[in-house]
Amino acid sequence: MAGSTDFDLYRPAEEHEMLRETVRALAEAKIAPYAAAVDEEARFPQEALDALTAADLHAVHVPEEYGGAGADALATVIVIEEVARVCASSSLIPAVNKLGSLPVVLSGSEDLKKKYLGPLAKGDGMFSYCLSEPDAGSDAAGMKTRAVRDGDFWVLNGVKRWITNAGVSEYYTVMAVTDPTKRSKGISAFVVEKSDEGVSFGAPEKKLGIKGSPTREVYFDNVRIPADRIIGEEGTGFATAMKTLDHTRIT
């Protein structure tokens, strides 16, 4: 075929093709059989999480130094694509694990990376991403969730909306205003744990599809977290949020 060598430029590497075959086989054998029930019953696809975790495919983006595969963006796309081929709800497990944890990868301290990326890589907990709010969707910089410094702690108050896998994930990257006079440059990012006192969740949203992946509000009522759970420097949270979307919205 004329010009076929040009198409070779876009051909995935052999390792990516092998990954696709592996994920497809796993998805067809261990995820597809439950897909209809997951959607009809609007229940979280625990079978998919178990299968992906057992195969180390639940968070392939985590760097090797923290126990992950250190996979590139294309590998992440392939995993998401092949899982979505049989169950869209299940595909949001690897997708949102990356979305939620990438701020830590990009901007977190070394201690923060060790504390949260290791458990993520081992499958001990999932990550979610808390940016949008009831009155701050497309205008994310207009968020109202606040984080106030109190000695060696930050105290968070507010609500986040449309949070994927909320209530299932153990860890949440939360964007909150730390200096309301600076708008986007007054927003900081934090890691909040589901077990932190004052964290609660709204009822699952009723959706037309992808019903197995819960979408819920997340409430923060005087949630006190250690000061070292801030991601990066104070005031850099919005920049980190946008960098995260640059990486993850394409995958």
Give a label for each model feature.
Residues 23-31, 108-115, 151-157, 189-199, ...:
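Long, well-ordered alpha-helical segments
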Residues 123-131:
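A short, Trp-centered hydrophobic/proline-enriched beta-strand micro-motif
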Residues 153, 157-202:
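A short core secondary-structure module
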Residues 145-148:
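A structural signal for short hydrophobic beta-strand segments in well-ordered beta-sheet cores
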Residues 54-124, 165-171, 183:
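Internal helix-loop-helix
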Residues 95, 135-138, 162-165, 179-181, ...:
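Short Gly/Pro-enriched turn/cap motifs at secondary-structure boundaries
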Residues 138-139, 154:
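Hydrophobic, small-residue-rich alpha-helical packing segments that form membrane-like cores
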Residues 7-14, 19, 85, 199-251:
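Glycine-rich beta->alpha junctions and the first turn(s) of the following alpha-helix
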